[in-house]
Amino acid sequence: MDILHRIGIQNATPEKVYDAITTLDGLSDWWTEKTEGETGLGGVIAFRFIPGGFDMKVTELDPGRLVRWEVVDGPPEWIGTTIRWDLEQRGDYTIVLFKHEGWREPVEFMHHCSTKWATYLMSLKQLVETGEGAPSPRDVAISDWH
């Protein structure tokens, strides 16, 4: 089972969006301020939230087109899943097709994560379009789980 989202980022090149997804500064400006690690191929990036977090291994990079990570540590539901970002220029927009692939079953946590991914993707869009995102802990609280 997969979580799927699509956003369009206006007046931004795929390379600019790619940089926001593949650099520590970019990631900490839209996803979580507590981001560290190695963002190159084979590197592991640690993302920390209140509470908890997860580690992602960078498994594929195609500049301006594709980013793929494998979850190597974190909540049991996430371990072994993959995060994929496909980027494509369409007119004045960079289209981002986002996939969190490989969920074993549609547990309540998957529902929560799907909504949180949507809020973080809007933060990515906001960052690239305006220069300011809404990363954790300044993100939108969607429920009692945050």
Q: Where do the PLM segments sit?
A:
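Hydrophobic pocket/interface hotspot
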Residues: V17-Y18, L27, I45, V58, ...
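Beta-strand/loop substructures that line and gate deep hydrophobic ligand-binding cavities in soluble
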Residues: P75-Q126, P135-P137
